[in-house]
Amino acid sequence: MQYSIEVNNQVEIFDLNKVAKQAAGAVMLRVKNTVVLATVARDDVQVEEDFLPLTVQYIEKAYAAGRIPGGYVKRETKPGDFETLTARIIDRSLRPLFPKGYAYPTQIVVMVLSADPEVDLQVVGLNAASVALYLSDIPVNRPVCGVRVGYIDDKFVINPSNSELKSSALDLYVAGTKDELLMIEMRSIAQQSSQIIPIIAIDPMMDPSLNDSITQKQDMNEFSEDRIVEAIDFAGKAILRASNAYEEAFKEHKKEDAILELKPEIENENIAIYIDKFYKNDVKNAINQMAKSERASELGKIAKQIASDEVAQKEGWEEGVISNVLGKYKKKIVREQIINEGVRADGRALDEVRPISIETNVLPNAHGSCLFTRGQTQALVVATLGTDGDAQMYDILTEKTALIEKFMFNYNFPGFSVGEASPLKAPGRRELGHGNLAKRALAPSIDINSPYTIRLVSEILESNGSSSMASVCGGALALRAAGVDTQKLVAGVAMGLIFEGDKHAVLTDIMGLEDHDGDMDFKVAGSSDGITALQMDIKLGGISLEVLKEALYQAKRGREHILNLMHQADSKIEVNEDVLPKLELFSVDPSKIVDIIGQAGKTIKEIIERFEVSIDLDREKGEVKIAGGAKKNVDAAKDYIISITSKENSRGFGKKPHGHDRRDKDRQKPTFNIGDEFDGVVKSVVDFGAFIELKDGVDGLLHISKIKTPLNVGDRLKVCVSEQKGNKISLSLVE
């Protein structure tokens, strides 16, 4: 059975009961030439643990774009970063829909079978998964819809195409039901524009247009709190339209809810009553233990004590059941203290940020580093600068060619940061998600045309909530410590929310306890002028626009406080120039690039080896980028390249001068005999010796082992040829 729904700037064609009919729910969704299959499967046996055992997998098939997987193994292997992040979006959007106490292992699989380059796979993937879940026998009684909002030509656009999104200042992804918002991800996208600046004419007869200077201006495109609320409201109306359309089309096809046993919120009410009567103060004292490991230890002691009590022995209360009830009672106390007394576990006010300390360039040999500590959360963020050759290449199903990423952010969360003895493993979904959020927050502040490839690594050394936002703050200062001239400092703060009946409380800079026992995790990052990135996950049924606005403005006050401290630290940064890579960027005639490369790359390899530098070339623009550890090596390599591109006999690929052939070119190569003597001039001095100009612009290397006294550029000395291999000439001093 097929349904066609035209909504939110796209036509969605759903196929029901056509494929995967043994799954609890399945739907095939087509938008233009994109086809996605979403399935839902459920086990019949509950897990004993107190959590929702939901697994979401998003898989892109290479054949969807008419490709065969690259590499030695010609099949899809582990998911890429985009697949992992998309699976997280779907998971976070659908998880709040499941009823409390649902403990049946459930798997949602979304497979991309055909990919249209212009269709947003994250929007289509979530909508397909939502309908499949809604149609299943799992007691989920409302569909979720995901939409993306762009900001193009000063107006909001719903579900822009992939090409349209590239010209957008905003990338906002919102998921929700017709009544509530469930998940939000947002980033601002920096844009460059040309700016004409009039200058004073030197020659009054000059063409007036030549009296103008054209410069590039970059706008971070931060969004104010009001504009964000406006954009989310715009998305909410689109979600309402789609959700109503889904319900109307599919409610008749929804399977009857399976008869499932839901776990009670409190496994044994008598234990809860007993704890409240005899151990309430002990639980409150345990809550005040800030470290997760210490708090767990104290609660464990209380559980053991209760289990040894005569009442527990008589009633047959098992320690495991007592621990579960105690954990839920602890959550109740935390929430009651916040709602009724305005008191947080660490004694802070609801809008108070924990104490902050900042140290920069704590690692002497790293390009830039920052140790950012906020309460019991500590991030060591390290910046490394590289060249174009260090950039990350990756494939996207909707792009024909590999994309190049020159700004990377890696987030690492070792077990010792929370006092656990756990093995160090490859980064999981959480690490990838936190790193991606920090990257999105900082990216607009970095020059789009930066000559460097930049890698930030955040090592979480302590964690008690908000480690991703500590990574943003530390990352902004690590960039400055590495000499990267970012446009503005960016700070981040994690917000929380507690709902009890008709009361609610918004919390600034939440710690781990408040994250675990609260109803919302809302991370907001930005500069003093607005928001560059945010992420919201909701644990209850949803959140209203009014409460969201309150949280945004409270986050702004917290962010401004943090930025003030960061500006103080920034003013004290001393960049360690000695460890930074040296970079030279210059242009030559594009036709001369081939002379720099040489036959089969021989010349450029010799330059790289001789001067110990890395070289990146732009054939079309004629741009040459040289990077190295020593400035004199970089300068010497630049001089050498300029010399070989300025020779009259150098010529571009395919430009054969009239009357010359390959034999003429061979005859033009300088040839010397061993022992030939010359009055040479020192052209450049490098770590391993000096380059001496002999005749006709030909250079030779006088190795440092043969130099007895210091040499300077321009010195004249008598040398002789000791060896020649191709164009490489080795020299010795003539006594």
From Swiss-Prot:
Its cofactor is Mg(2+). Pfam families: KH_1, PNPase, RNase_PH, RNase_PH_C, S1. It is an enzyme of class 2 (transferase). Mg(2+) binds at D515, D521. Residues 581-641 form the KH domain. Keywords: Cytoplasm, Magnesium, Metal-binding, Nucleotidyltransferase, RNA-binding, Transferase. Its EC number is 2.7.7.8. Residues 649-671 are annotated as: Disordered. The keyword Metal-binding applies. Involved in mRNA degradation. Catalyzes the phosphorolysis of single-stranded polyribonucleotides processively in the 3'- to 5'-direction. Belongs to the polyribonucleotide nucleotidyltransferase family. NCBIfam families: PRK11824.1. This is Polyribonucleotide nucleotidyltransferase. It comes from Campylobacter curvus (strain 525.92). The lineage of its organism: Bacteria, Pseudomonadati, Campylobacterota, Epsilonproteobacteria, Campylobacterales.
